[in-house]
Design a protein with these regions (language model features):
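Conserved P-loop
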Residues: 2-74
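Short amphipathic alpha-helices and their capping/turn segments at secondary-structure boundaries
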Residues: 20-21, 64-79, 111-123
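Structured helix-beta-strand junction loops
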Residues: 27, 56-57, 77-78, 121-122, ...
């Protein structure tokens, strides 16, 4: 089974996703695919909170800022996978190096293909994404490209 959770920032999506991934696992291995590459103290604090939330839930954390399928090559496909988050994964693919100032034109396609391949390879997966489309603000070209790319990936 594949489950997609989308919503506003910091509203409990990850906690819900953890509960669902545990239920889906039915005693099988649980994997938490952590996609955030921390850039500052706020990111590190969020990572600490998420780790504390998972404490006792028996998730094996797989750090996969990019190339998810390569990162899980030794994982059990019958296990339960929680990918948190599609939003961070897309950012990592669009800007693959810390100094990248222009988005990689193939980043969104690569991200989408990785996620579709993950769906094909594993039995159960829960995907977390941020809903960033409802504020009605017109953004610069880079941000609009990111928003369009995330919407395209979320629909997959």
């Amino acid at each position: 089974m594949k489950i997609f959770i989308s919503g506003g920032c910091k509203n409990g999506k990850s906690s819900l996703a953890q509960q669902l991934a545990v239920k889906l696992s039915q005693g099988k291995k649980r994997y938490y695919l952590a996609t955030m590459i921390p850039c500052d103290g706020e990111d590190l604090a969020r990572i600490r909170r998420h780790r504390a939330d998972r404490d006792g839930l028996e998730f094996e954390t797989v750090e996969a800022g990019r190339n998810i399928c390569a990162a899980i090559k030794d994982c059990d496909p019958a296990g339960s996978y929680l990918l948190d988050s599609v939003t961070a994964l897309l950012l990592n693919e669009l800007y693959p190096t810390p100094t990248a100032s222009e988005p990689d034109p193939d980043g969104a396609l690569r991200c989408r293909q990785e996620l579709l391949e993950l769906c094909d390879r594993v039995e159960n997966a829960v995907f977390v994404s941020d809903y960033i489309y409802a504020d009605g603000i017109a953004y610069d070209a880079y941000t609009e490209n990111y928003r369009r790319s995330l919407a395209w990936i979320d629909r997959a």
